[in-house]
Amino acid sequence: MPLITNVIARQILDSRGNPTVEVDVLTETSYGRAAVPSGASTGVHEAVELRDGDSGVYLGKSVMKAVMNVNTHINDRLKGMDVTEQVEIDNTLIALDGTANKSNLGANAILGVSLACAKAAAEYSGLSLFRYIGGTLATTLPVPMMNVLNGGAHADNNVDFQEFMIMPIGFTTYSDALRCGVEVFHALKALLKKKGLSTAVGDEGGFAPNLGSNEEAIELVIEAVGKAGYSVGSPTDRGGIGDAQVMIALDPASSEYYDADRKKYVFKKSSGKELDASEMAEYWEKWCSDYPIISIEDAMAEDDWEGWKLLSDKIGSRVQLVGDDLFVTNTRRLADGIDKKVGNSILIKVNQIGTLTETLQAIDLAKRNGYTSVISHRSGETEDTTIAQIAVATGAGQIKTGSLSRSDRMAKYNELLRIEEELGAEAYYPGVKAFRV
């Protein structure tokens, strides 16, 4: 029986130079390490990331309280437990914290421990993490959402919407799909240079030029796909995917420009336009008729259930509508959405909920109710590649892990290449079959 002998946490730095938590879990015969990501645009319903708040140390962002919680309370409680009992470990962590949002010990402390335990258990079992979690049928590589153009909270420019992404859906292998993404990324860089626009990148490695409008952003991405020699689909109400190799995905992160008091969506970075929920839903309906969009994440604000319902009724049958801030990887909020027939997909961020068990429960609930799952990074990342392993373990079929630059993003793409190699002939890339619209 692989009993936990020590749980050790330390403060490290993430891809934005901010402190985060890294945890080592040791047993008598195995070891696991996990580092915790952090978001820039965070939902109000997310589990709480515990930071010290001392403005004189790392501008208040130090995580030494969370580190100490791991090294004392959590270490004392988990010592002697069987590291392969993931559910028991996670339930113990939840009970030890004693709050609904993990604000006592910190979700960053709890998550680091939860993931490190899974890795130690996988090593003890002599298996890759994706095999340990997912079993012998874990053979599906995810279709990536590649964030090539940034705006919103992820970039200092005049684009309201946070992420403009490409999805290489017309391929039969992950490695070919990845190559497509890389070539489109470089074609976009050349296109921006030719137009005299900045090729500086945002938090997730996508370009962040100052553009005249939100429309110009998506049109540049579509143009870059063609310049790279790939075909882009049609709008989903006019033929849609067909034999296209690439479709477009968006993450507007609408909660960031939603005025909850006035119930208005305010395009404050670009035109200053103000739209109510009905007008915002119509806006997205028009975009999905004008552009080859297959997926929109957080198209409406996190608590604008009325707006979400309007949009779901309008385009939910032909466009993947992903709830991130809406569902926050939380089974209770997802169950509400399912009951209200809102959205048709959930974004899975391990640090939104705080344990591996709860993450897997959210994916399972989505799957049982016909919702897709997209495994996701955060804007503040590390070299940790756990989400790549989770994507394959769960057969989610989709992953969102940034652009084709910055080593913190490339680490996940490269890990998927290694998994594809390990799987060999068993590796399956679903392409368009990853979607249910």
Curated annotation (Swiss-Prot):
PROSITE patterns for this protein: ENOLASE (PS00164)
Keyword Lyase appears in the UniProt entry: yes
Enzyme class: lyase
Cofactor(s) this protein requires: Mg(2+)
GO cellular component: cell surface; extracellular region; phosphopyruvate hydratase complex
Subcellular location: Cytoplasm; Secreted; Cell surface
Residues that hold (2R)-2-phosphoglycerate according to the record: Q162, K349, R378, S379, K400
Pathway assigned to this chain's UniProt record: Carbohydrate degradation; glycolysis; pyruvate from D-glyceraldehyde 3-phosphate: step 4/5
Catalytic residues in the record: E204 (proton donor), K349 (proton acceptor)
Keyword list, A-Z: Cytoplasm, Glycolysis, Lyase, Magnesium, Metal-binding, Secreted
GO molecular function: magnesium ion binding; phosphopyruvate hydratase activity
Assigned EC number: 4.2.1.11
Reaction equations catalysed: (2R)-2-phosphoglycerate = phosphoenolpyruvate + H2O
BP terms from Gene Ontology: glycolytic process
Protein family (similarity comment): Belongs to the enolase family.
Name of protein: Enolase
Organism: Chlorobium phaeobacteroides (strain BS1)
Lineage: Bacteria, Pseudomonadati, Chlorobiota, Chlorobiia, Chlorobiales
Encoding gene (name): eno
